[in-house]
């Protein structure tokens, strides 16, 4: 949630003089909803929030699209990192809908909702994916209109042409470190792994 990003937001603001927007994802913090959308539906909210930020900060001095000075970094941690990567693939005809987004920073994001849930079933409960994960996936599709396989940061980063910084510590037990490597490999240049 947004509170978790306060320290990073502070650094962006104080050290780099960036304006910051720290929204809560659906079902977290002060956001509405009771169920996490695991980044998939949240990616569309983030795109709307970037529009709002552009209206607040970029149109202050002019209404001309060409002369706006808004430049944005989309940065997320864990599920927020997966959301960041899911946002990164939202392109139409090779163009980003939000030309003011300049780069992405993902810190410990997962490859896909399916992979994350499958890993947690095994790590926490020593259970296989079938039948529980398959059933939960079907229920999610019925209730929320998306499924765990569709919600793939891995597929989204393949479409990303903007710079992305990948951060993943080897002590992370919730999102396994191995997930950063296929994500990094799938992302076209420019990219960096830290």
Listing of model-derived features with the role each one plays in the protein:
Residues 1-11, 178:
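The serine-hydrolase catalytic nucleophile loop
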Residues 9-32:
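Conserved alpha/beta-hydrolase
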Residues 36-63:
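Alpha/beta-hydrolase active-site loop
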Residues 59-78:
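Alpha/beta-hydrolase fold nucleophile elbow
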Residues 86-149, 155:
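Hydrolase active-site cap/lid region
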Residues 153, 162, 176-185:
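Short alpha-helix in the alpha/beta-hydrolase fold that links the catalytic acid
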Residues 159-161, 166-168, 172:
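Short beta-strand/loop motif that positions the catalytic acidic residue
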Residues 184-194:
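Catalytic histidine neighborhood in serine/cysteine hydrolases
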């Amino acid at each position: 949630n947004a509170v978790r990003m306060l320290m990073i937001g502070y650094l962006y603001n104080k050290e780099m003089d960036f304006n910051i927007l720290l929204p809560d994802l659906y079902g977290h913090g002060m956001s509405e909803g009771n169920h996490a959308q695991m980044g998939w539906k949240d990616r569309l909210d983030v795109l709307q929030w970037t529009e709002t930020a552009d209206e607040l900060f970029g149109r202050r001095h002019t209404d001309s699209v060409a002369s706006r000075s808004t430049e944005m970094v989309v940065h997320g941690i864990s599920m927020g990192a997966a959301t960041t990567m899911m946002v990164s693939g939202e392109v139409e005809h090779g163009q980003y809908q939000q030309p003011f987004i300049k780069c992405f920073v993902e810190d410990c994001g997962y490859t896909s909702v399916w992979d994350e849930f499958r890993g947690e079933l095994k790590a926490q409960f020593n259970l296989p994916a079938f039948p529980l994960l398959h059933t939960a996936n079907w229920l999610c599709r019925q209730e929320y209109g998306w499924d765990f396989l569709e919600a793939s940061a891995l597929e989204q980063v393949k479409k990303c042409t903007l710079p992305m910084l990948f951060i993943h510590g080897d002590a992370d037990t919730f999102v396994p470190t191995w997930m950063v490597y296929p994500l990094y490999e799938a992302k076209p240049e420019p990219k960096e792994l830290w």
